[in-house]
Amino acid sequence: PAQPEPGDPAEPTPDNPTEPEPPAPATSQWVHHAEGWRYESADGTWLKDGVFEVGGMRYAFNTDGFVPVGWYRAPDGTWYASTENGVRTGWYRDGSWYLLSDSGAMVTGWQVSGGTRYYLNPDAGGAMATGWTKVDGTWYHLDASGAMSASTWVRAGAWYYLGESGAMATGWFKAGDTWYYADASGAMRTGWVSDGGSWYYLGSSGAMATGWLQQGATWSYLRPDSG
């Protein structure tokens, strides 16, 4: 057969070299070990000590690079609920209820979820509070679902009133168009009450009476502007 002439395109020359195939790019992948899952790179390194996004999901990795299962505390002190499928978000139950942000970080203090106010108690590890809870010196009431009570009465032996902010009322307070009086413990008073050198009468419902009041054969006049 005819030999190709020098310079023939069929024969590789320095001016027309055959390009080698480029090497496959280094990739990272999930690798399962006895200790759990780790996200490893081809160069022998892996993710560790934090929360990172992999494939559109956020995962926690401990100091050895493994995905923990359960509560994980990041180096900055933030808590996450870690699973093999990524960190949890939203409401999470582990004995008590906890609230996790969109990034998975546990939140504490007053939080609004679904239009309802909740208190995640930092003194209880972030657990959702229920019942009577004192925050910065003020008493609040959270129902069994954790929702803060506001502008409503709560009965716990005595009657207590929670204002619009959720704070328990003490002293004189107005609910609707009616005046009431609660002692220092927040318990609604009834009957005669002395305050500031004046006497006031509170009916069985706790409402302050005004005008003429008859008790047995005795009549008393309670000023409409102040009781």
Q: Which role fits each region the language model picked out?
A:
Residues P1-G227:
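Extracellular adhesion/carbohydrate-binding repeat motifs centered on closely spaced tryptophans
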